[in-house]
């Protein structure tokens, strides 16, 4: 959130009255929603396949291992890598529980919000998108049939045309921002 604030402040110092939309995918969408709820410079917020809680998918035994080792690894199916998730993330979430309360943040949003999620997302379940929408009934929720967590993209992506699902998500987002 600190880094995002610095980027927004820089943008506001370089452009007169910028119309800022925050857009984030997965955890980035969560960070965007948290920031948008507390920053009047933000005009819209869009989340793609974003969690409604940063820690709700971490079982207790995994948290204990995290505390013991200082790091857990999360497999990224697109890149085939085990991505490190350091204990600092967990301790930040615990120490700043109130500031990182997604339900409270989303409930307090007074700007336009678009939530997009695939109903075949194995990483962040579609229930989380429905929770976000429930907490802000004024939000626009769009659930894309048969779409996964990355809307058909993969890594490395070496094709000029976007996957059909991702192109639809991009088009929907642009339409939302331009309303």
What are these regions (language model features)?
Residues 29-39:
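Short glycine-enriched nucleophile-adjacent loop
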Residues 15-26:
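Alpha/beta-hydrolase fold nucleophile elbow
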